[in-house]
């Protein structure tokens, strides 16, 4: 996926799912399922329910995403 093709949105983690998947509610009200990006996984970034995160989504499937940043 090319970097210019992604849609970045802010959201809040609603629920933790198996296999490091998370249910995230975006600012516009949509709920997506997102996984952790490789760099966050490598650096052991912990994500908990209620955290504010940045989610990257592809325009081809807007129901799935990748968590690329966790706000402090």
Swiss-Prot record:
**Principal localization?**
cytoplasm
Is RNA-binding set as a keyword in this record? yes
| Domain (S1-like): residue spans on this chain | 1-72
Which keywords, in A-to-Z order, does the entry hold? Answer: Cytoplasm, Initiation factor, Protein biosynthesis, RNA-binding, rRNA-binding
Output the Gene Ontology cellular-component terms.
Answer: cytosol
Q: Which GO terms describe its molecular function?
A: ribosome binding; rRNA binding; translation initiation factor activity
**Location in the cell:** Cytoplasm
Q: Which InterPro entries match?
A: NA-bd_OB-fold, RNA-binding_domain_S1_IF1, S1_domain, TIF_IF1
Gene3D superfamilies attached here?
Answer: Nucleic acid-binding proteins (2.40.50.140)
**Pfam families from the xrefs?**
eIF-1a
SMART domains in the cross-refs: S1 (SM00316)
Subunit record text: Component of the 30S ribosomal translation pre-initiation complex which assembles on the 30S ribosome in the order IF-2 and IF-3, IF-1 and N-formylmethionyl-tRNA(fMet); mRNA recruitment can occur at any time during PIC assembly.
What is the protein's known function?
A: One of the essential components for the initiation of protein synthesis. Stabilizes the binding of IF-2 and IF-3 on the 30S subunit to which N-formylmethionyl-tRNA(fMet) subsequently binds. Helps modulate mRNA selection, yielding the 30S pre-initiation complex (PIC). Upon addition of the 50S ribosomal subunit IF-1, IF-2 and IF-3 are released leaving the mature 70S translation initiation complex.
Task: Name the PANTHER family for this protein.
Answer: TRANSLATION INITIATION FACTOR IF-1, CHLOROPLASTIC (PTHR33370:SF1)
Recorded family membership: Belongs to the IF-1 family.
The family database entries (HAMAP family) matched by this protein are listed as: IF_1
* NCBIfam families, per database record: infA
Tell me what this protein is called: Translation initiation factor IF-1
Q: Which organism is it from?
A: Pseudoalteromonas translucida (strain TAC 125)
Gene that specifies this protein: infA
């Amino acid at each position: 996926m090319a970097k210019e093709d992604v849609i970045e949105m802010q959201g809040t983690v609603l629920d933790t799912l198996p296999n490091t998947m998370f249910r995230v509610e975006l600012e516009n009200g949509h709920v997506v399922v997102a996984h952790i990006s490789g760099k966050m996984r490598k650096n052991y970034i912990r994500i908990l329910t209620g955290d504010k995160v940045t989610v990257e989504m592809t325009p081809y499937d807007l129901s799935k995403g990748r968590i690329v940043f966790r706000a402090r």
